[in-house]
């Protein structure tokens, strides 16, 4: 589970990636298929973003990463443009600015059931205007 967009691995020999990573104890599980957690740059770097994205993506990784199915995709986009591909994720999050009790809060719309490749499908709206804590509970309830 990582927060980066892409990782390229180059090698000289024909030793398998699993063997090479297994030799380094800290990387021993790196070759196993895991869930992908993607986040757009969010408000820190994007003028279109409505919410900060990386903190939530990191919380999802820390709190739910081991429970997410291998190959699943969780996508955190800071606005409806969906730069992190929320519309095709198993769990897609789209940032929205809203208010509760008269106070502006950062919130997310939760989309579920998206797919890529042979299982291509658009994710469907599941819940709206969730805080980060509510997002974690909503995803955990669906695992």
Model features per residue range: what roles?
Residues 1-103:
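Small-residue-enriched alpha-helical segments and adjacent helix-cap loops
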Residues 87-143:
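Mobile "lid/hinge" segments at catalytic clefts and subdomain interfaces of large enzymes
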């Amino acid at each position: 589970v990582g927060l980066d967009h892409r990782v390229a691995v180059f090698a000289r020999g024909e030793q398998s990636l699993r063997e090479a990573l297994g030799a380094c104890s800290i990387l021993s599980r790196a070759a196993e298929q895991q869930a992908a957690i993607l986040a757009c740059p969010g408000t820190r770097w994007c003028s279109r973003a409505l919410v900060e994205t990386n903190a939530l993506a990191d919380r999802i990784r820390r709190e739910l990463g081991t429970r997410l199915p291998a190959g699943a995709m969780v996508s955190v986009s800071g606005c409806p443009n969906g730069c992190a591909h929320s519309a095709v994720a198993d769990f897609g999050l789209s940032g929205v600015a809203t208010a509760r009790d008269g106070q502006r809060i950062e919130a997310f719309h939760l989309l579920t059931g998206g797919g890529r490749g042979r299982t291509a499908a658009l994710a469907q709206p599941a819940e709206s205007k969730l805080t980060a804590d509510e997002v974690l509970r909503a995803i955990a309830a669906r695992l």
